[in-house]
Amino acid sequence: MVAQSGVGTVSTKQARIAELARQMPGKAMCSLSHHMDQAWLHEAFRQTRKDGAVGVDGQSAAEYAADLGNNLRALEPRAKSGEYRAPPVRRAHIPKGDGSETRPIGVPTFEDKVLQRAVVMLLEPVYEQDFYDFSYGFRPGRSAHDALEALDRGLHELRGGWVLDVDIRSFFDSLDHEKLRQLLRQRVTDGVVVRLVGKWLNAGVLDGGVAVRAESGTPQGGVISPMLANIYLHEVLDVWWVQEVQPRLRGRSFLVRYADDFVMVFSEQEDALRVQRVLAKRFARFGLTLHPEKTRLVPFCRPPKSGGRPHTGSFDFLGFTHTWGRSRRGNWAVRRKTAKGRFTRALRTINQWLRSARHLPVEQQAIALGAKLRGHFQYYGILGNSVALSRFHYEVRCLWRKWLSRRSQRAYVTWDQMNRLLARYPLPPARLPWRSRQLWLANL
């Protein structure tokens, strides 16, 4: 009952925080944590995902929820008094791109996730008044598809141009703790909030049973990490771009950022080269390094109407490879398809799951595979990507047949048998759930 009755109270408090932040641009908010009462913590619990992996204490969401009232009543005074000790995060490694590298993910304890969510709920209404419209990552009411839509519209308005495709090396592991604290205190000086953020930055990680204290970085996977990343890059990149870079450019330009993944687009090559030269120096001042091989300037000008094949490059952004292609009316339009690395990684993940689940009943496999396919199509199902979606659907069917054939020495499944199985347990077809939002592209 506390959680349900407190939702309206929490949203009202957040609206007040937002209004104060809007009335005091550039000034520090010194009183936020008094809002973090039991209703606030119950709402933070409600918003916290319950299906995630467990942290170093091994406690699941269900186990924490079994005594939720007492747990939250004990958490509030510890969080506000400074007695709360942030536990180290459990480190896991997941493959990146084509699998040649891995990305470290930090898994906090469930209680830590709840408290981090509560602090995010305090910071969000403040920083939403400051963040620019071209920033899309981990913000309320914004998504990766919104960022892709903004990029498409900008490219068509500029008729292409020069794309600075930027890759920050190990961004989440490279955040300078002291600089992050300084940037945070420019807008928030509430002692409880600043202290809790400091505890999370200093908590360290448990990697393979070995405790490691990190002097920089914030673990990916933490609830607070995306907010801290946005605060950092808002000052390091966004404000710099708006106040110092764009006023000095000769031509038109725009920036689209999703967390640490961003592209800059310029109508003039000279502008692009100038920014490319100074960007690395700017980032180095804040402890960040650009990947020398993955950061590149891509010619992406729209070909002439009467021209043949475009003599331009391509670039990847948010899992899609962007190129120029012909629309249904024969005009040039930006085309997007699933990036090769993402395609390969998604298939590898399904292959690994099928291997581990090959002895489950076929009906259970079909249900799980259907959910995985729907998730893939939900993200990659955009206009112009139907070929990649159909191919992915076909490859998944092939993988399923392969692992069904390996259930035993006598379990070989022919394609006739597989087709009968698919008729009984059909997988969801390749769909374009984002088609309606992008029909304007098809009519160019």
Residue ranges and their predicted role:
Residues 1-444:
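Non-catalytic terminal/accessory segments
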